[in-house]
Amino acid sequence: MLKTIKTKKNTTKYTLVALVAGFALLSVGSSYIHARSAQKLSNSNLSNITANTNTDGFQQSNHYNTPKGFMNDIQTIFKGTDDYYHLYYLLNKNYKSSNDGTEWYHIRTKDWEHFEDLGVAIPKFVNGWSAVASGSVYQNSNGFFRDLPKTAIIAYFTSYTETGQHQYAAYSLDDGRTYHPYNHSQPVMKAESKEQNFRDPHVWYNESTKKLMMYLAEGDKVGIYSSTDGKKWEYQGATMLNGSTLAGKDLGLIECPNLKSFYDPQTKTTKHVLLFGANGYQYGSTTGSYYMIGHLEANGNFVAEQQPERLDHGTDYYGANYYQESPTRVKSIGWMGNWEYSQGQILKDDGQEAKHIGSMSSTHSLSMTQKDGKYVVRSRLINNNARTSGLRTKQSARTSKTAPDGYHKELIKVNRKASQEISLHFANNTANTKGHVRVFIRQKDSHVSVDLNTETGTYEVKRNSSKITGEAKNKYEKAYAVHNNWQNRQRYFVYLVADKGSLEIAMPDGQIYSLMKLSSDPNMQVVVESSTDNSVSATLCDFQNKTR
């Protein structure tokens, strides 16, 4: 029997607790949800909230959607003088039309949930540059730029010009809302050739040398440069990410480098972490976000100590950016998309090609810990949006009917809204969890399946959609298998954040799998099956729409 949990609007009236291998896991407010998730953040006084302004049918309720066109890479996240968190992303408002090209679009937030549109901050095709691509900003609070006030914000970005990928600079005097060309509209760095990969500058200040540092994506390496004035840059090394440094398997084209530090309170150790976008095609994966643990030399060069690891194991967490919240915590937001199919032929309900698509991920909270002799970055989803219409059930394979395949037992089959929080606690009735547990998210135009092997610590994710056609469809519907190394346990916990066009899966031990699902259906069916004598305790709640 399914039980409805009576809740009031904007409040959560219950908390379901399970003890898993010594960790307290909460279905609402879990280790995968920030502890503040039960607070009433829906009373935010943000104005002009536009989380649901995508009008082509692909809008999401619980994620930020671009107001028009096509969005991709997330740019620097910084805290402004107005006490808001500001970020930019690449927007092509003329997607698949004339005057095609990206520019920096500006949004801000106070709670990492509700976002306010502020408009285009760095426009394309002006001031000597062409389309505006990825980069980062530097707040001049220490007066490094002597010709600019300490309140200035300086943006460095790549522009794809007719002669190659060049780095430009611009400055803002109004908290990042508008930018003016710096260095007389001339590039501060130029690619040596039209073909050279030379982009996505990440700038930061090196306290040891009193120089400004720049990390650049250069094909299979991250180039490292320094400057005493922010205009003239000197090469001082590189972090190689080719096959010879990665045990024979490269990571394809490197993009969007970033650098953050993490302190592990257990070992009392601080490490620097190089974050970047790459292609895991040689590792049974696709493009995604990666990290590498290491340290900095005094001159600002990054030195790797471990091999790269996948930050988010899903297909659609790319062009991510990061905010250093504290020595132990970094927040991250990614673009929910993939260059292999996001620009393919995606269809609206009327059969016409969609020219308006794109959303951001939920915020990830990152921390570092030591496991099996090496340091790993763990992620948890932050979702403080209000929950309503709770549903709780506990089912056992012993008393459940046989699934249509004649083999699995159907533990749960329920119709819900597409924007949904799903907490699943699995246990075996006699011993450790065994066999396969399958979770299906079904919409009229989209299906996603997650097949968890509780004995081997692996899971496989498959999806299909009638909204995508052509070659991109084959790439979109390719299945991927992932190791989560969580096997032979008495308890197995899976937490899912579903929305109309996305699914984020939090596995035990801090692993997240994010994916885009192309759908315009506002409803879905949730099905949970088991191949053996497992039981499940499940809680499902509607996420309240972020818009007013």
Where are these regions (language model features)?
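Bacterial Sec-dependent N-terminal signal peptides
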Residues: 1-17
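Carbohydrate-active catalytic/glycan-binding domains of CAZyme proteins
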Residues: 38-548
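Sec-dependent signal peptide cleavage junction
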Residues: 25-41
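Compositionally biased, intrinsically disordered low-complexity segments
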Residues: 8, 20-23, 531
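Classical Sec-dependent N-terminal signal peptides that target proteins to the secretory pathway
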Residues: 13-28
